[in-house]
Each structure stands twice: as structure tokens, then as C-alpha cells.
From Swiss-Prot:
Major subcellular location class: cytoplasm
Cellular component, GO annotation: cytoplasm
Location(s) in or outside the cell: Cytoplasm
InterPro entries: UreF (IPR002639), UreF_sf (IPR038277)
Function, as annotated: Required for maturation of urease via the functional incorporation of the urease nickel metallocenter.
Gene that this sequence comes from: ureF
Family in the record: Belongs to the UreF family.
Protein known as: Urease accessory protein UreF
Organism: Psychromonas ingrahamii (strain DSM 17664 / CCUG 51855 / 37)
């Protein structure tokens, strides 16, 4: 096996590790408003689950998280920590409810704690960024993927998968869905990733951001939902 092949294999393994549901950052604790949507019967089966997640991907994740992930990578490439911090602040400001902001920051904080303890990744050059008082999960994901020498497309694709996997896992418990239905959703939603990356990477700075009022309201109302499995 050639060195290039070994490098390619290692990078794939690192990507799989970063996107694993076993990554101890608490993603399983948050439904991102989906729990309230199920409570209100906005989501009741495989079709409506697909529509809910696909809308969030195309109108929010691609136009905010993925677009800013590109800016974060550009900032890391040029060692422009000021630009990185501004992009991070932009991400946090785009969270449309207290719960969505809390979920993003809580996962970011857990990821920072993990990253600093990983022996195989030297995060010291980015200690200034990692010691910021508030870091979005997306920002820490960007640093981790960059340290693993993943290219932007791999990082963005992996981030998409992380979101899709988390949402489908939450829907499987909440709707509920069967395991085969969940696998069909994973296939169908992951087929959208190329299109999502195209949208994200064509956006100009002033075009970044998208509002989903129903998601924001579901997340806000979830705070007072009578019974809950998830923290958001």
C-alpha cells in the first residue's frame, strides 16, 4: 500500500470518527426542535420526517452552517484568527432560540474539552481560538477537521452527515419510526448533500443566513413542553 493510499485511508477514518454518533459531545441529547414538532403532529411518519429535515438542511444548514464552515476553513488556511472569531460570532448570532443557541454552545464546549485531550491531534496552535468564551460546535468541528487534514468538501459533507444522522436517530425514537424507515431516510437525505454543498459554496458573504420561523418557534415552545426526552 502506498503512502498516499495510507494517508487517504487515515483521512477517511478520521472523518468517520469526527462524524460518529459515539463522539462524546452530547449531540444525542438535542432534537433541534423536532421533539415539539412531533408533539404538535407536524411530523407523523417517514414522509413528514423527510420533509422536516430536508427543509432544515436546504434553508438553514446549507445557508448558514455550511457556508460559514467554508469561511472558517479559509480563516484557518490563512491563519486569520480575527476572521475565524467573527465567523464564529456570526454562527452564534444566527441561532434563533435560546435552546438552539444552548445546544450549539454546549456541544461546542464538550468538543473543545475532548479535542484538548486527544493525544493524536496537536491543538496547541489553535489554543487562542479554543479558549474563546463561546464557540459554536461548527467552529470546533472546523478546527478538528482541519487538524485531521480533511479538505473542505469532506468536512462539509461530514458535518451534513452528523446533522442528518442525529435528526433521524431522534425521529426514530419520537415519531416513532422503524429501523428500515430510518435507513431509507438516511439514504434519501444523504443524497441531497451534493446539492447542499453547491448552495453553500456559491453564497456571497451578504447572502449567508436563513430564517425558519416554524423551527425557531418549535424550539422556543419546547422549553415549556410538559414531557421531554431531549434538551432541545
Amino acid at each position: 500500500m502506498t503512502a498516499d493510499k495510507q494517508s487517504s485511508t487515515l483521512k477517511l477514518n478520521r472523518l468517520l470518527q469526527l462524524c460518529s454518533a459515539n463522539l462524546p459531545v452530547g449531540g444525542f441529547s438535542f432534537s433541534q426542535g423536532l421533539e415539539y414538532a412531533v408533539e404538535m403532529n407536524w411530523i407523523s411518519g417517514q414522509k413528514s420526517t423527510f420533509e422536516w429535515i430536508e427543509l432544515n438542511l436546504s434553508e438553514s444548514l446549507s445557508r448558514t452552517d455550511l457556508a460559514i464552515l467554508k469561511r472558517l476553513y479559509q480563516a484557518l488556511d490563512s491563519s486569520d484568527f480575527t476572521a475565524f472569531k467573527l465567523a464564529n460570532q456570526h454562527l452564534i448570532a444566527c441561532r434563533e432560540s435560546s435552546e438552539l443557541r444552548f445546544a450549539d454552545l454546549a456541544m461546542g464546549k464538550a468538543f473543545v474539552r475532548l479535542l484538548k485531550q486527544l493525544d493524536s491531534l496537536d491543538s496547541e496552535p489553535y489554543s487562542e481560538l479554543l479558549n474563546e468564551p463561546e464557540l459554536s460546535f461548527v467552529s470546533v468541528f472546523a478546527i478538528s477537521a482541519y487538524l485531521c487534514e480533511l479538505d473542505l468538501t469532506a468536512a462539509q459533507s461530514g458535518f451534513c452527515w452528523t446533522y442528518i444522522d442525529n435528526q433521524v436517530a431522534a425521529a426514530t425514537k419520537l415519531v416513532p419510526l422503524g429501523q428500515t424507515q430510518a435507513q431509507n431516510l438516511l439514504f434519501d437525505l444523504s443524497a441531497e448533500v451534493d446539492h447542499l454543498l453547491t448552495i453553500a459554496n456559491q453564497l456571497k458573504d451578504h447572502e449567508i443566513g436563513g430564517s425558519l420561523p416554524r423551527l425557531a418557534m418549535a424550539s422556543a415552545w419546547h422549553e415549556t413542553q410538559y414531557t421531554r426526552l431531549f434538551r432541545s
